[in-house]
Amino acid sequence: FLTLSVVSSFLLADVFMTELTDPQNSSDAGRYVELYNSGDSDVDLSTGWALQRWTNGNADPQSAEALTGTIAAGGFYIVCNNADKYNATYGLTCDQDFGTGDAADSNGDDNIALLGVDGSVVDMFGVPGEDGSGTGHEFEDGRAERAADNTTASATWDASGWNIDNDS
């Protein structure tokens, strides 16, 4: 059992968020959350992984949105808010479409968490309960990109681990 716990914890740390976008502050422009698997093994996200969003400074999050599919070892996985608009904006296909109003549809001042198979926060962007407007995690009309030297998941937000581009 201890071995299983250690292995599970190691696998959880291999997947983390690398980018969140709010292009043109519009859900029509293909908002998305990008995940990365830094591990040596593929990860089946349908085993309980999810994304969750806190909006407008609310202390209570929206419902967790289940992830599906598999993220390859060393690979990326894109969760978008609208597959057609994502394709029109970037010329690419997202891996999973959550739809408008869900965890991949942030207007740049929301807080987003990657939840592991046990429902705990594996990686956190922002501070739950805090409206991100005017803070170090606001990416309205822009994007938040994980810094190159920030290569592990963290359940606690640290602004120094991210490069933020916004209209303010």
Model-assigned labels for residue ranges:
Residues G136-H137, E145-S168:
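Extracellular low-complexity, O-glycosylation-prone Ser/Thr/Pro/Gly-rich "stalks"
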